[in-house]
Amino acid sequence: NGHEIAHHGLYHEPSYGDTVEEQLEIIDKSQEIFKRIIGKPAAGFRCTGGLCEEAEEVLYNDPNTLYTCQGESSELPVFMEVKGKKTHTVRISCRQEVDDYIQMVYNAYPPIPAGLPRISAYEDVLSNFKDEGDGTLRFGGVLSTAFHPQVSGSPGKSKILDQLLAYITSKPEIWCTSCEEVASYWQKKGGAANV
């Protein structure tokens, strides 16, 4: 209760299949699992691999797909377009600067420094997250994070999340909410021109 659920597919696969049917089958199976466990389909789709245009057309016109977090980084949400037509699905960028996987996972390539793996200093990661939040406040926009239980769930790394949440909630000017609420707001306003 209180947590937002979006899905990546069944197995965090880099590809959802070679055909429209294979791709939609994986998405449908994933949604069936959510319906069985949490009683409803996931409102968001966080694509780990590419979808063919025909699968995107079905997915982003599905009333259950409120938002996606795929595509290039941007400060404001946009409506997804497929074949030149705007869909109701809102794309909310999940920027790499605030993705725990990008910031904290063991990195063998590129080896930085050469010959050694890298795990970022926790204080640096927290500072990066805060700086992105401050910049978003200064210039405006939406900042969507990504936290993976297998990354941020360790005892030491969980402190980063605790401290970041304390920092965010200490600022009354931040609307701290779910991607589902951001997408609903964006849909009601009709996009950037009306916000």
Positions of predicted regions on the chain:
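Catalytic alpha-helical scaffold of carbohydrate-active enzymes acting on polysaccharides/glycoconjugates
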Residues: 1-44, 48-91, 96-97, 123-145, ...
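Glycine-rich, positively charged active-site loop/lid region within alpha/beta enzyme cores that binds
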Residues: 91-115
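Acidic/histidine-rich, metal-coordinating catalytic segments
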Residues: 148
